[in-house]
Amino acid sequence: MRILCDACESAAAIVFCAADEAALCCSCDEKVHKCNKLASRHLRVGLADPSNAPSCDICENAPAFFYCEIDGSSLCLQCDMVVHVGGKRTHRRFLLLRQRIEFPGDKPNHADQLGLRCQKASSGRGQESNGNGDHDHNMIDLNSNPQRVHEPGSHNQEEGIDVNNANNHEHE
């Protein structure tokens, strides 16, 4: 099952932007993130081709369609109806979309593959490039440790000052 682009609602999404909480196709990703300096900094991860359906944790036969947060299990429709009776009806369950994501550090040349998929999806339409024929895809490695940037006035938490509280008291 492919996820449709949240912006145009017609093409298959190839990236997910966490800041916008949106899955976007190549064309909409370029429109949203390339034309705006602030939006271009948004962290986006590639959406992989849908994976095979995981099997139900109970019967291990049928494809799982639900995930129960409380039980921590993936369930098919039949097992979900059997397991979640009585008081268990209140368990929060989620639909499994079978949509994998590709983190930049998982595969070599991930940005290149994303660019190729984007080119195939556009099939001949003009695309922005960085001047030497390569498409500019600034992907961030989510597996790397974040770098802490100290700006003037950003060290209030370190000094024990609660910036959200009007009664700033030094912690002992």
Curated annotation (Swiss-Prot):
**What is this protein's name?**
B-box zinc finger protein 18
**Keyword set includes Nucleotide-binding:** no
Q: What GO annotations for molecular function exist for this entry?
A: DNA-binding transcription factor activity; transcription cis-regulatory region binding; zinc ion binding
Zinc fingers, B box-type, are found at: 5-47, 56-96
Q: Where is this region: Disordered?
A: 119-172
Q: Give its localization.
A: Nucleus
Induction or repression: By blue light and heat shock (at protein level).
List the biased-composition ranges (Polar residues): 120-132
Please, one GO biological process term? cellular response to blue light
**Which UniProt key words apply to this protein?**
Metal-binding, Nucleus, Repeat, Repressor, Transcription, Transcription regulation, Zinc, Zinc-finger
Q: Name one GO cellular component term.
A: nucleus
List positions binding Zn(2+) 2.
56, 59, 79, 84
Q: Is Electron transport one of the keywords UniProt gives this record? A: no
Q: Name one Pfam family in it.
A: zf-B_box
Q: What is known about the tissue distribution of this protein?
A: Expressed in vasculature of leaves and petioles.
Instruction: Quote the PANTHER family the UniProt record gives.
Output: B-BOX ZINC FINGER PROTEIN 18 (PTHR31832:SF36), B-BOX ZINC FINGER PROTEIN 22 (PTHR31832)
Q: Which organism is it from?
A: Arabidopsis thaliana
- In this chain, composition skew of type Basic and acidic residues spans 148-158
Q: What does this protein do?
A: Acts as a negative regulator of seedling photomorphogenesis. Acts as a negative regulator of blue light-mediated inhibition of hypocotyl elongation through increase of bioactive gibberellin levels. Acts as a repressor of thermotolerance by modulating expression of a set of heat shock-responsive genes.
Q: For Zn(2+) 1, which residues are the binding ones?
A: 5, 8, 28, 33
Q: Which InterPro entries match?
A: B-box_zinc_finger, CONSTANS-like_Bbox1, Znf_B-box
Fetch the Gene3D superfamilies from UniProt.
Classic Zinc Finger (3.30.160.60)
